[in-house]
Amino acid sequence: MNSAFFEELKARGLVYQVTDEEALQKQLNEESVKLYIGFDPTADSLHIGHLLPILMLRRFQQNGHVPIALVGGGTGMIGDPSFKDAERSLNTLDTVKAWSESIKGQLSRFIDFEDEKNPAILANNYDWLGELSLIDFLRDVGKNFTINYMMSKESVKRRIETGISYTEFAYQLLQAYDFLKLYETEGCLLQLGGSDQWGNITSGIELLRREQEVQGFGLTMPLITKADGTKFGKTEGNAVWLDAEKTSPYEFYQFWINTDDRDVVKFLKYFTFLTLDEIATIEEEFTANPGQRAAQKALAKEVTTLVHGEAAYHQAVKISEALFSGDIQSLTAEEIKQGFKDVPTYEVQPEDQLSLVDLLVTSKIEPSKRQAREDVQNGAIYVNGERRQDLAAELTETDKIEGQFTVIRRGKKKYFLLKY
């Protein structure tokens, strides 16, 4: 095993809290350790808030350990109260099952379930929680924990004033039971999670100690914060998903390329597999010439390639460059769809007049014919990146990209899409 591995995790800032660090380091240095992270299905896709823990599993696997990705098919039906301000809405079994299947597919893009030496393991806690009777749960799990112990957890304390249901109160015991089951079936000794999971993780370690008389370990990663105070993982209020159908590779790339200067080096350490020496070199270049955004470009390249593949990364760069230069005609219809997903779109009807001035008004790009004429004459209207100043101009087949789209720009930055 790589004895420097744990030190590198710390150097990257990936270790927030750890139980018995010395004993854990010894274990990691001496043998291949089985470890797990749980992913509760709360939607049909994982998002970039899950990326740090997923990549932690990958880091451990690359260093000879065996990662277990636990899909919370059972716990996902209840909802973890950890540092949530309100009770979660409950999802149906069919919904959670469908979400669990989607998540399984996504995880296999990051960790190797076929590796010859240390293949990753995929588990679903519905397999045991779905069969667990209330009597068995109270007898085998509940008896090991006092109410005082459970109430002492910070995640529970924060909800006492506003109210917490017994269902969510008992969540930490279900997560503790997961750790016990994974120890019994797989020999798993280490649980990883975000810093909000510390209370749940230590409950699992306590259950292992009481039921099996073994020492389990817990390690948490830091809560990801952004220098500007906004929530990590959201762009304009929307989650950034790992599923290309929900967040296009172009949007994904844009999220990373727009990283704040104050966050970018930290994110290179968190989210890429560049060595610390490589990151230090990028940091030097970035510090010397921040306007070139070398660090943001490296971050966006590494993470987009990791999640969506090299072809999607190159496509995202092509779209970005075309939008910056105005060379819209170099884009395919698929690239137009990605790059202009969020701009106002008008579906051109068969009866619509195809004169430029008329279409500008019909599509509500312009409020009136007078304003449309004025903007055309003044050179403020662009069709697929080309300025059009002819008041009698009509849109022709050559203005339709692959027969599907025409991109209109008004002024410097206002984009609109005509769809055929």
Swiss-Prot record:
SUPFAM superfamilies xref list: Alpha-L RNA-binding motif (SSF55174), Nucleotidylyl transferase (SSF52374)
Record carries keyword Membrane: no
Location(s), subcellular: Cytoplasm
Domain of life: Bacteria
Motif ('KMSKS' region): 231-235
EC number of this enzyme: 6.1.1.1
Entry-linked InterPro entries: aa-tRNA-synth_I_CS, aa-tRNA-synth_Ic, Rossmann-like_a/b/a_fold, S4_RNA-bd, S4_RNA-bd_sf, SYY-like_C, Tyr-tRNA-ligase, Tyr-tRNA-ligase_bac-type
Annotated motif 'HIGH' region, positions: 41-50
Enzyme class (EC, first level): ligase
Family matches, as SMART domains: S4
HAMAP family (UniProt xref): Tyr_tRNA_synth_type1
Role played: Catalyzes the attachment of tyrosine to tRNA(Tyr) in a two-step reaction: tyrosine is first activated by ATP to form Tyr-AMP and then transferred to the acceptor end of tRNA(Tyr).
UniProt record similarity statement: Belongs to the class-I aminoacyl-tRNA synthetase family. TyrS type 1 subfamily.
Protein known as: Tyrosine--tRNA ligase 2
Organism name: Enterococcus faecalis (strain ATCC 700802 / V583)
Upper taxonomic lineage: Bacteria, Bacillati, Bacillota, Bacilli, Lactobacillales
Gene name per UniProt: tyrS2
